Design a protein with these regions (language model features):
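Internal alpha-helical scaffold of NAD(P)-dependent oxidoreductase catalytic cores
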Residues: 43-47, 128-220
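Interdomain hinge/lid region at the active-site interface
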Residues: 216-274
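Conserved dinucleotide-binding and phosphotransfer motif residues
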Residues: 26-27, 63, 109, 156
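NAD(P)-dependent dehydrogenase/reductase Rossmann-like domain
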Residues: 268-302
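Rossmann-like NAD(P)(H) cofactor-binding subdomain of soluble oxidoreductases
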Residues: 38, 48, 52-127
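Hydrophobic Val/Ile/Leu positions in short beta-strands of Rossmann-like dinucleotide-binding domains
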Residues: 7-9, 69, 139
Length: 302
């Protein structure tokens, strides 16, 4: 490997800012940034020594050896198509869902193309900065650029995994399930606490230790051993009580609860704590329509 490349960023949102700051701290030369929002570019440049705000994406590409496209996914291809790329330069996007195929214009001009997706959540810039070191990074690139990206991941203290283009959508769907939909589940859970008089922030605070404990159990015990609760132990009576309470007080939450409980049955069976008979009873219970005719509640159709 030769000297570290001069890096530039097109896009100065949470991902770009966190990645630029972490790479700068790791000894990389971050020389330029351009963004549709000039204030965001100025904020990024102010936190990375030696980084200049440039007026256009083309100016960044002209100055840098390796350009990170850290725009929203739906803007990547448009940005790349609008740049005249130098042969031998490199362009990398940070989308988790899209492959390097969207960089075909740059590749046709002789640029190396790749993707580097941090498997991490970026709710705000400072939290992203704290979360990024040590994360998993999905890498897709051809050989020379691949080696550069693997070195970048190593320098960030991360763990690299390599994906084929056709694997990206499933990989990203898994990330969405774990990260984004956990937030949705917390919203649904706190909705129930609102029903018995709590404010949402207090409910979140009360439930967070349980969430952290679950994550700790998954880390320590793995799957399916980390599963606990009424489905895991075949507690049909408790599930019946839950369903009745939800049908009465929170019918909007009931379909999600039932579907998740059904999806939990094979996990509990694999753990060995749920008998086949109890699994059958729960499956029948969870498939039952709990809404009276004409109530307008959601009904299972499968």
């Amino acid at each position: 490997m030769g000297p570290k490349p001069k890096l530039g960023f097109i896009g100065a949102g949470r991902v770009g800012t966190a990645l630029a700051r972490c790479l700068g701290a790791a000894g990389y030369d971050i020389v330029a940034v351009a963004s549709r929002t000039s204030s965001a570019a100025e904020t990024l440049a102010a936190t990375v020594p030696g980084c200049s705000v440039l007026p256009t994406p083309q100016a960044v590409a002209d100055r840098c050896d390796l350009v990170f496209i850290t725009t929203p996914d739906d803007a990547i291809e448009t940005v790349v198509d609008g740049i005249a790329w130098r042969p031998g330069s490199a362009v990398v996007h940070t989308s988790g869902a899209k492959s390097t195929d969207i960089l075909s214009t740059a590749k046709a001009q002789g640029a190396e193309t790749g993707s580097l997706h941090p498997l991490q959540t970026f709710a705000d810039a400072e939290q992203a900065l704290a979360n990024l070191p040590g994360s998993v990074f999905a890498v897709e690139a051809e050989e020379e650029l691949r080696q550069q990206l693997l070195a970048i991941v190593s320098d960030l203290g991360g763990v690299a995994i390599e994906l084929r283009p056709e694997e990206k959508a499933l990989y990203h769907a898994a990330a969405v399930l774990v990260s984004n939909y956990t937030v949705t589940l917390m919203k649904l859970a706190t909705d129930l606490w609102l029903r018995f008089g709590w404010e949402r922030p207090a409910a979140v605070k009360a439930l967070l230790p349980l969430l952290r404990g679950t994550v700790s159990n998954i880390a320590a015990l793995g799957l399916p051993a980390a599963l606990t609760g009424p489905v895991a132990r075949g507690d049909v009576e408790t599930i019946e009580r839950h369903l009745a309470a939800l049908a009465e007080a929170a019918p909007d939450v009931l379909p999600a609860y039932k579907e998740l409980a059904l999806l939990t049955l094979p996990v509990a069976l694999a753990k060995g704590t749920l008998s086949d008979d109890d699994a059958a009873s729960l499956r029948a219970l969870l498939g039952r329509d709990l809404f009276p005719a004409g109530s307008g509640g959601a009904k299972r159709t499968s």
